[in-house]
């Protein structure tokens, strides 16, 4: 997901012990659009190093957890005045960051975290380069600290290139763990992973981590679309034909799975409603346009996005959430998302019956929306890659 900001960019690598920090400096030449919302610092006393995910623990403690790409997770109390955060997990020595799209990318708490203390992470490791889904457990002595010795590797998927790793992991309303994997990288999906259901790449997976099969750390739900009756197909696949679904989320009211898929060189950035067994087109199509071949492609059996935009609005979509909080009632039921490169945030209204309606909320060239998150009350937060966590407020007249 974390494409380099354009049009003028400089990359500086700072080596500090085992850590490598990639700082992307840029200058954009873009017309500033009028915004109906503004940013405000959610936790003005806290800063982070390249935050890429924000989650809350489902244990009633009203804590938030911010994932730093370098390999650390910080825990802190969800209060604007908070000044203290705790290192919940530090796996920088295991995380590989050879490219700006690698690192520690995702965090998911088990639905019964309060009882079992389990949480899961998605990161890139090296030798061989691979995506790792691992489980850890909360320390029995300190709820603000994880027990590193509890690590259990659930799944590993080899990555042929450094980019398009996906990174989001989410427990669905059914209790299964959903995992986003990009097409394996390079450009244009040279190995056609998006349309190859024998590989896990280019897909969203669905696995059961509570009832592992013999010899595995998970099982495949019997109602997965390729479970048990498709020779050669990877049974873990829930949906496929995706390029790099960096961020996805479930609407807690409707149960819909919303995914934002980062585009190629056209580029077309797209939003999909992910459904079981559906093929979302990549690399036959990019969004609603033919990609391979560029003209006259066969669209039969492909599911097109509910919304897309092109390079005049941004070049790297960051998926968000359907807003179900109470602070901003005018956003209720709308999908809030953004673009990492242009600094735009939008709301998308879609009921499944009528065409989606999109509206600009904010255009801030100083915002780097790498991810979104929600707290226990479904209030929305925005992770900016420059180290700050924001929330929205209505713009002053």
Where are these regions (language model features)?
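Beta-propeller blade signature
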Residues: 133-141, 193-209, 273-275
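N-terminal Sec-pathway targeting helices
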Residues: 1-14
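Acidic, Gly/Ser/Thr-rich repeat motifs that build Ca2+-stabilized beta-propeller blades
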Residues: 17, 22-188, 247-259, 264, ...
